[in-house]
Amino acid sequence: ILPTGDGMALVFFNSVHAAFKCAVDVGKKTYKHPQIGLRNGVYSGPVVPVKDINNNPNVSGSGINMAQRCMDAGDNDHILISNGVHQYVNQMDIPGLKFEDWGQVIVKHGSTVHMWTAYGPNFGRTEFPTWRGTKKAEFKSE
């Protein structure tokens, strides 16, 4: 667990399944408490442990950066995952688990990430993020 100012990052070095299950489990616990304002982004990529300028534990790498981009694309209660994560977790045995393909989402610096939203009866959401404007403006056409 790494503090990030007004949030935190949970880093899983060895299991994309564990990272995704954690996002779902936390989503279930906070689903009925919208005042918490939690968004989840899950991405699988290189992450290495480092020390920050104050010698505190931290991580670096595209994995943590892209997980942040996935999270930033959502509203409260979204569980947004990259296409690579979806390929690993789409058959997990989680009651009611469903996915919606959002395609190529434009993120920071104009780059794109193929994202899916994960949801179920008491976690996640499918609605397009209200703060991002229209779907057409934020998604790259295929």
Where do the language-model regions lie?
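Cytosolic regulatory/linker segments at or just downstream of nucleotide-handling modules
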Residues: 76-141
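Catalytic core of nucleotidyl cyclases, primarily class III adenylyl/guanylyl cyclases
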Residues: 1-21, 25, 29-63
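An N-terminal, helix-rich hydrophobic module
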Residues: 17-21, 39-48, 52, 60, ...
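Aromatic-enriched hydrophobic runs in primary sequence
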Residues: 12, 38, 73, 116-119
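Secondary-structure boundary motif
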Residues: 28-32, 72, 91
